[in-house]
UniProtKB/Swiss-Prot annotation:
InterPro entries: Psb28_c1_sf, PSII_Psb28_class-1
Keywords: Membrane, Photosynthesis, Photosystem II, Thylakoid
Keyword Thylakoid tagged: yes
Gene responsible for this protein: psb28
Protein name in UniProt: Photosystem II reaction center Psb28 protein
Listed GO CC annotations: photosystem II oxygen evolving complex; plasma membrane-derived thylakoid membrane
NCBIfam families: PS_II_psb28
Polar residues composition bias: residue spans: 109-127
Locations listed in the record: Cellular thylakoid membrane
Quaternary structure and partners: Part of the photosystem II complex.
GO BP annotations, alphabetical order: photosynthesis
Amino acid sequence: MSKAAIQFFRGVNEPVVPDIRLTRSRDGRTGQATFRFEQPAAIAPETMGDITGMWMVDEEGEMVTREVNGKFVNGTASALEAVYSWKSEQDFERFMRFAQRYADANGLGYSQSQDSDQTEGADNQQA
């Protein structure tokens, strides 16, 4: 079983663990996960190459988003923000399986927002 990982460059795992926030439509069919990486290795000065996407890789395969933006402070890259969107319950369930594997691989926990409408049902998903 391969370890779940996030990559900005194919084959290179990002060591910085992001803050991840989920939002879902009321019917649960659509939604998005916003990933925020503070000082990720992918934007270190010694890293050469353009970031063209964020890959979420695990034993089932990979998911990708091309919606990746840099955040700058005083002209210096300080963070990356990526948004992964889903359009069906199956896509959401697949994302949650990845998220559980990624959390397990990185010793992370899950906490539900005070605004339960945004993450309703997310904590009931089984890996």
